[in-house]
Amino acid sequence: MFSKSVTLAQYDPDLAAAIAQEDQRQQDHVELIASENYVSCAVMEAQGSQLTNKYAEGYPGKRYYGGCEYVDIVEQLAIDRVKKLFGAQYANVQPHSGSQANQAVYASVLKPGDTILGMSLAHGGHLTHGASVNISGKLYNAVTYGLDENEVLDYAEVERLALEHKPKMIVAGASAYALQIDWAKFREIADKVGAYLFVDMAHYAGLVAGGEYPNPVPFCDFVTTTTHKTLRGPRGGVILCRDNTHEKALNSSIFPSLQGGPLMHVIAAKAVAFKEALQPEFKQYAKQVKINAAAMAEELVKRGLRIVSGRTESHVFLVDLQPMKITGKAAEAALGKAHITVNKNAIPNDPEKPFVTSGIRIGSAAMTTRGFNEADARVLANLVADVLSNPEDEANLAKVREQVTALCNKYPVYGA
């Protein structure tokens, strides 16, 4: 029998120490990785609950195991809340990740060898949108579109390629594109060639939920998202549809095709996050995320850096480091020493290798969760520029680190 009085620190001090160190790192560092965020204590409580003990293959009311009457309630809460949040008629909350949600969408209506048209990874797309190293690029005939000479999504190219290749599915969405995407234009192009339209809104879902980014659900046959990133929930995925046309095919694609038992403790945490995103204060959060990102981009331009696409209309933007004569890899390392966490990222037509890159990606979701306002964002942008202007000067890095520490102490991740 397990005792509730035995703590992790008592039973496994080595693991507890590593978790404590990560907790301290999150407190002491400013998180600017666009795909990361902080979850609430309620989300963590749900994810750490005894729901992890329960197997529940199938769907609410249609399980292959007994004893599912209470986890059915949990899953139905998550389904109902996410449908309300995004105005969807169908929702599947079981995908373990965004990648698996995407796989399920493909498998529901495509056959191996069918043509898909998605955004190039090199121009800001995602691995799962047909990259050659991903299963999506191996199973399907992937054709890619990108940005025009102004680094704006090239809708004319999308239409030209669609007319030329007649894809069975067009994929929209990105992992490193700062501007708003025109879902209606994609719908128009898809209809011209009789293609399914699938949007992966993983990066923008929180902004969509908060009314600060266009909702793709009314325009699309399929929508997926992760539940972390800007949505501020546990790590996982969701599939949404505007109607129930593909319900049976999608449900079968997740179970039994791609997954077995759902992670009920994670689904519970998703339900909590969806409830949080339905609250009025989440709209203010989403608004502040955009304000902070725009403020940072403006300050970095003033300091001589170039923003890919010229500006941001979301939570994320890419910084071209070539004017500073520093690589993304070197910038990531230098900023890390100053307790500012970013990720190196390729920019369009990047001359550097993918593990080196000429850019970094910056996102404002996590810092905004901590409470950073526009003035703080501008201060932080200048600290980033201070590091990039002199990345090898240890005294400079120490000075910036001291200022970052003061900011972090002002805005603890988890208060009392």
Swiss-Prot record:
InterPro entries: PyrdxlP-dep_Trfase, PyrdxlP-dep_Trfase_major, PyrdxlP-dep_Trfase_small, Ser_HO-MeTrfase, Ser_HO-MeTrfase-like, Ser_HO-MeTrfase_PLP_BS, SHMT-like_dom. The keyword Cytoplasm applies. The keyword Lyase does not apply. Transmembrane segments: none annotated. It is an enzyme of class 2 (transferase). The modification N6-(pyridoxal phosphate)lysine is found at residue 229. Gene3D superfamilies: Aspartate Aminotransferase, domain 1, Type I PLP-dependent aspartate aminotransferase-like (Major domain). Disulfide bonds: none annotated. The record marks 228 as: Plays an important role in substrate specificity. It catalyses: (6R)-5,10-methylene-5,6,7,8-tetrahydrofolate + glycine + H2O = (6S)-5,6,7,8-tetrahydrofolate + L-serine. One of its GO terms (molecular function) is glycine hydroxymethyltransferase activity. It is found in: Cytoplasm. GO terms for cellular component: cytosol. It holds the Pfam family SHMT. Belongs to the SHMT family. This is Serine hydroxymethyltransferase. It comes from Neisseria meningitidis serogroup A / serotype 4A (strain DSM 15465 / Z2491).
